[in-house]
């Protein structure tokens, strides 16, 4: 499963991960999940940090949450940037049948995430630019791409 969210949009994803944590408490290791989460500042906005660390220790989030702190450095870093950086892992999970959950603002974020996933499919799947976009559309048609966005 791939989870992606900026800011407070992470709340519904936390609930999904907590459910998985309970469901797989007796199964070792649980199926891999990747959380890509964004906020402005590590020290002020890192929501649910303790939960992500506990889930990493339990093996639910191997490597921990992938976090984009957009204001902690000169160049802004967003979740779509982190998705591209994690491209090989994202592609492997998608090819293994992962579902994608995108939660947060309905403004520019959903399109930026869709474009980042298309870039991942293009680069790591060798699909070409049009093939990458078609791959992401296919995820929607297969009901593997889920949006929970608001304005």
Residue ranges of model-derived segments:
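Reductase modules of NAD(P)H-dependent flavoproteins
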Residues: 18-24, 30-151
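Central I-helix of cytochrome P450 enzymes
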Residues: 5-10
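E2/UBC-UEV (E2-variant) core
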Residues: 11-16
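Short, small-residue-biased leader/transition segments that mark boundaries at the very start
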Residues: 1-2
């Amino acid at each position: 499963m791939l989870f992606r969210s900026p800011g407070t949009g992470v709340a519904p994803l936390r609930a999904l991960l907590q459910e998985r944590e309970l469901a797989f408490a007796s199964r070792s290791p649980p199926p891999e999940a990747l959380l890509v989460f964004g906020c402005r500042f590590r020290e002020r906005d890192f929501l649910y940090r303790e939960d992500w660390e506990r889930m990493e220790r339990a093996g639910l989030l191997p490597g921990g949450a992938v976090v984009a702190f957009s204001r902690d450095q000169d160049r802004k870093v967003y979740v779509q940037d982190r998705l591209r950086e994690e491209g090989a892992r994202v592609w492997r999970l998608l090819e293994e049948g992962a579902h994608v959950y995108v939660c947060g603002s309905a403004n520019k974020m959903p399109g930026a995430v869709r474009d980042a996933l298309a870039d991942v499919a293009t680069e790591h799947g060798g699909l070409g630019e049009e093939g990458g976009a078609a791959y992401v559309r296919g995820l929607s048609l297969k009901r593997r791409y889920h949006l929970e966005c608001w304005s």
